Every structure is written in C-alpha cells, then in structure tokens.
C-alpha cells in the first residue's frame, strides 16, 4: 500500500489534475491508501454523526503526544476525504489540531465548491469531531 503524501505534495498533485473527474479519482485513490480499520474499532464511539455515509475515525495519542488517526467509510469518495483530513492533521499534537484551520487548504484545492452539500456537511462533521476529541486530549 502506498503512503499518503504530505500536505504540499497533496496540494501539488491536486492542482495537476486536469479536471474534476481526475480530482475525484485522485481522492478515491487516496482513500484506497488508508490502512484497513479493524472491526473492533467500528463502533458507535468512533462513528461520526452528520455524515450521510458510515464513517469511523479512531484517534490515539502516541508516547510523543502526537495524534495517530485511522478511519474508514463505506463510500469511496468519503474515504478519500478522510485521507485528505488525515494528511492535513499528520504528526500533530492535540493542541496543534485544535489550532489548525483546514479551510484554507480546502480553498487552495477548491475542494468544497465541488462537493455535494451532503458531502460538504459530512466533511465539516469529521473536522468538528476530530477537533472536539483533540480538545479533550490537550
């Protein structure tokens, strides 16, 4: 399985896509790169409310205080959006996550204006849930 790119490479790759069909395919590819989420982590505590699709996000804090994220969805495009969020929050502490605004990155990728309203709401729900959980750990 290929590793996820860093923030800058994600943005470059996104900008290299010729059209939105290519961007959607790239988002799906990113989702396919996520590590498999085990069945024990697919429970209501890790479920994200406000998403039309099933979404699970697991947050664990490692010994260095850095948050490690795992997630999955039953929808390919949503799984790709999870991957994008994970790329943006990669190697951050809980306080870093609380303080970091992902919206400028979404604007640079022109991401939200090309998502359906329900997917945009689901993306916002994921971000709110991650930030809320990070706030309890910081």
UniProtKB/Swiss-Prot annotation:
Chief location of this protein within or outside the cell: cytoplasm
Domain of life of the native organism: Bacteria
Keyword Cytoplasm (UniProt): yes
HAMAP family, A to Z: SufE
Active site positions: 51 (cysteine persulfide intermediate)
Protein's UniProt name: Cysteine desulfuration protein SufE
Biological or metabolic pathway of the protein: Cofactor biosynthesis; iron-sulfur cluster biosynthesis
InterPro entries reported in the protein's UniProt record: Cysteine_desulfuration_SufE, Fe-S_metab-assoc_dom
Transmembrane spans: none
Pfam family, one: SufE
Record's GO cellular component terms: cytoplasm
Keyword Cell inner membrane assigned: no
Compartment list: Cytoplasm
GO annotation (BP), single: sulfur compound metabolic process
Subunit (UniProt): Homodimer. Interacts with SufS.
Similarity comment text for this entry: Belongs to the SufE family.
PANTHER family hit by this protein: CYSTEINE DESULFURATION PROTEIN SUFE, SULFUR ACCEPTOR PROTEIN CSDE
């Amino acid at each position: 399985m290929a590793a996820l790119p860093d923030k800058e490479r994600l943005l470059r790759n996104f900008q290299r896509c010729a059209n939105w069909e290519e961007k959607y395919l790239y988002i799906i590819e990113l989702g396919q790169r996520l590590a498999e989420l085990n069945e024990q982590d697919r429970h209501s505590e890790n479920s994200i409310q406000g998403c039309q699709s099933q979404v699970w996000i697991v947050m664990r804090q490692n010994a260095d205080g850095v948050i490690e994220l795992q997630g999955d969805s039953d929808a390919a495009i949503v799984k790709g959006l999870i991957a994008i969020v994970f790329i943006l929050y990669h190697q951050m502490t809980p306080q870093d996550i609380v303080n970091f605004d992902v919206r400028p990155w979404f604007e640079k990728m022109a991401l939200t204006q090309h998502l359906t309203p329900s997917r945009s709401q689901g993306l916002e729900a994921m971000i709110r849930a991650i930030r809320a959980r990070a706030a309890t750990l910081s």
